[in-house]
Amino acid sequence: MSHAEDNAGTRRDFLYHATAATGVVVTGAAVWPLINQMNASADVKAMSSIFVDVSAVEVGTQLTVKWRGKPVFIRRRDEKDIELARSVPLGALRDTSAENANKPGAEATDENRSLAAFDGTNTGEWLVMLGVCTHLGCVPMGDKSGDFGGWFCPCHGSHYDSAGRIRKGPAPRNLDIPVAAFVDETTIKLG
């Protein structure tokens, strides 16, 4: 009887297969922790998105919250702020990109930088931006500061308008807008 006709497994074949299976299990057990450690930890997942109640924010005022370790400005603009921002021609801006994570590649018009309400209408009333100067990472002052009625960074003199667009000073870009949306009439979800 030749070896090719012998279909019954021998003890040696069993040991080969058992050793190979054990090797696969041991390798998987060793590699799994290395792969699993690349997943986000619970504290990082908890910081990835927050809900902000804006029911107490009056027209013409601003709320600052901390998200992912950075300040976020939430301003409820009045009609004067909205009209001022919408009257600026795109060609007069240093940075013509909206820098809006909700609208990648959009132009820096006021409509592309403001946040739509829960019903989807965008009156320009709400503006949500990271409160970090795009020059060197300082925190600009709000309350209609600076030469353009928006924010002013006292560190190096950057002036932002009422839509958070850079108008004067060394900052190269508009203030960044994070992923944000209303989840109901009075709550904004960041992230």
Curated annotation (Swiss-Prot):
Result of altering C153 to R/S: Photosynthetically incompetent
Subcellular location: Cell membrane
Co-factor binding details: Binds 1 [2Fe-2S] cluster per subunit.
SUPFAM superfamilies listed in its UniProt record: ISP domain
Keywords for this protein: 2Fe-2S, Cell membrane, Disulfide bond, Electron transport, Iron, Iron-sulfur, Membrane, Metal-binding, Translocase, Transmembrane, Transmembrane helix, Transport
Consequence recorded when altering C155 to D/G/S: Photosynthetically incompetent
InterPro entries (UniProt xref): Rieske_2Fe-2S, Rieske_2Fe-2S_sf, Rieske_Fe-S_prot, Rieske_Fe-S_prot_C, TAT_signal, TAT_signal_bac_arc, Ubiq_cytC_Rdtase_Fe-S_su_TAT, Ubiquinol_cyt_c_Rdtase_Fe-S-su
GO MF: 2 iron, 2 sulfur cluster binding; metal ion binding; ubiquinol-cytochrome-c reductase activity
GO CC, alphabetical: plasma membrane
Enzyme class: translocase
Catalysis performed (reactions): a quinol + 2 Fe(III)-[cytochrome c](out) = a quinone + 2 Fe(II)-[cytochrome c](out) + 2 H(+)(out)
Transmembrane segments: 18-35
Bilayer topology term: Single-pass membrane protein
The organism's place on the tree of life at top rank: Bacteria
EC number: 7.1.1.8
Effect of C133 to R/S: Photosynthetically incompetent
Domain Rieske: 94-189
Binding site for [2Fe-2S] cluster: C133, H135, C153, H156
Summary of subunit composition and partner proteins: The main subunits of complex b-c1 are: cytochrome b, cytochrome c1 and the Rieske protein.
Protein function: Component of the ubiquinol-cytochrome c reductase complex (complex III or cytochrome b-c1 complex), which is a respiratory chain that generates an electrochemical potential coupled to ATP synthesis.
Note: The Rieske protein is a high potential 2Fe-2S protein.
Similarity comment text for this entry: Belongs to the Rieske iron-sulfur protein family.
The protein's name: Ubiquinol-cytochrome c reductase iron-sulfur subunit
Organism the protein comes from: Rhodobacter capsulatus (Rhodopseudomonas capsulata)
Species classification: Bacteria, Pseudomonadati, Pseudomonadota, Alphaproteobacteria, Rhodobacterales
Gene: petA
